[in-house]
Amino acid sequence: ELVEELKHELQGKIIIVNGDMENGVRNAKSVIERGVDAIISRGGTAYLLSQVYTRVPVIAIQIDALNILKTVRRIGEDKHIGFISYSNVIYQYQAMAEVLGVNKIPYFQFVDYGEEYRIEQFVQEAKEYGVDILIGGAHVQDYAKKYGISSVFLESGKDTVLKAIREAETAIIVRRKEQENLKIINDIVDHAYIGIVVFDKHCHVKKWNTTFLSMFPQLLQF
């Protein structure tokens, strides 16, 4: 919804695909394979997308401590709050809460990227701990509902979404420039009168021109 609101402020075409984690990757597959310049997501979904689509820049929307503090303020003072999220998100909140003296969350659990399967266990532990309401992402909400605990979705702020979009725009510009430079290099190699062979950082041959091949015709046997 937030991205829909921001679309009129942005240049370029933005395609919105709904989905979380594996569903998000699956739902985005057809759009990405038709051709996109960059992907923007957040949390574990961004991590999974970066593992699947290694040739496309994946920009993760960050959640800053201010978003978390705003979420905590919306929850009543008498609530026993639990927070399940990725370690970088929780560390941000803990650092700011310590400075401001507003730490109202007694139960924390850290999740590493790729270990989202542990979320259900953490939600069960939160219930046993006496947590009234959980803060977290979509997976936390799903399991909280399953175990009868109230939950609040940790939203990204407008500023963090805009920042991710700007990062994506920069990544696209850099990538296009790299592609232009690569084309120039390929043209030079292809049309050079001397023999040229190109190696990657692992010393594997990636490209050679016809002049080089005429000097070493035995390479045609490989």
Regions from the language model: what does each represent?
Residues 36-43, 82-84, 131-139:
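Periplasmic-binding protein-like
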Residues 28-61:
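Helix-enriched interaction subdomains in cytosolic or periplasmic regions
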Residues 202-214:
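PAS/LOV sensory domain surfaces, especially short acidic/polar patches at coil-to-helix junctions
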Residues 2-7, 18-26, 48, 56-99, ...:
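Ser/Thr/Gly-rich flexible loops in soluble cytosolic domains mediating phosphotransfer, phosphorylation
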Residues 23-35, 118-131:
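Short, well-structured alpha-helical segments in soluble
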Residues 177-205:
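Sensory modules in modular signal-transduction proteins
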Residues 216-218, 222:
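Glycine-centered C-terminal helix-capping/turn motifs at helix ends
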Residues 10, 35, 39, 48-49, ...:
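Carboxylate-rich, polar loop motifs that coordinate divalent cations or form catalytic acidic clusters
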